[in-house]
């Protein structure tokens, strides 16, 4: 995708870590993405030690002075969710005790986001609990991408900048010579997301799959609301976990006469048996995701396309550091 920050602007702004006191540090959940963000900004991924003791306890040490610095900690809380969340909390505490001026948690994938409300008695709202933990640990700001529900921003008592992976997905799809596009929401809850995506796809028509969930990680697709016959169907969701929802939707779209089916999602959780389901012959022409979560080699398959969101995250970090608008990136 086109770089948000041109070389000319970088020169004009004199973007250097020494003069701007911008510091990046990554945990262990997605170091590859952190390196790409650091390269985009022209600052190093700072030195730190993250290790585990024999009893399972985590240890973090920041290995350079960050006193008075604007610190960004890059750590999606993907699997193993609890370890990566705890590591992030320890990193925040270490930076706070090292007298960082401001600490921003960059969480491209926000674990526990699906536990955003009670669906039965005596349940925890774990998305809110996670937000409380981040705030209490000493975070000043959170930068997240494609939260499962936008209302999670309100769980934080600190600023939360919410950005979207859709421009990266749309830029890629625009190069694929697609015709007769229809954007499909895999469930009623994703209609707002699908409608916004369809608008970016030159106001493509919208279809909805009516789905009834029968249990955790289980879903049953019932019917398609809208016309998909003879069209290229783009199934859009925020994440793909086990693949049950989106694969059931794809089968239904094929039955309804869709000539091509492409799956798009920001977050590739890919819990087993997602890869086997998604790679089934003839189901998807492509499965397009981003690198918000690292994908292990054994979970890749021929139809998979992984796009980088490093430039987008890097630009958002730069704008936060410069105290300029983040939302204007998406206007």
Swiss-Prot record:
Catalytic activity: D-ribose 5-phosphate + ATP = 5-phospho-alpha-D-ribose 1-diphosphate + AMP + H(+)
This protein's pathway: Metabolic intermediate biosynthesis; 5-phospho-alpha-D-ribose 1-diphosphate biosynthesis; 5-phospho-alpha-D-ribose 1-diphosphate from D-ribose 5-phosphate (route I): step 1/1
Binding locations of D-ribose 5-phosphate: 213, 237, 241-245
Cell location: Cytoplasm
Protein name listed in UniProt: Ribose-phosphate pyrophosphokinase
EC number in record: 2.7.6.1
GO CC terms, sorted: cytoplasm; ribose phosphate diphosphokinase complex
GO molecular function: ATP binding; kinase activity; magnesium ion binding; ribose phosphate diphosphokinase activity
Record: residues binding Mg(2+) 1: 148
Binding site for ATP: 55-57
The entry's keywords: ATP-binding, Cytoplasm, Kinase, Magnesium, Metal-binding, Nucleotide biosynthesis, Nucleotide-binding, Transferase
Assembly, per entry: Homohexamer.
Alphabetized CDD domains for the sequence: PRTases_typeI
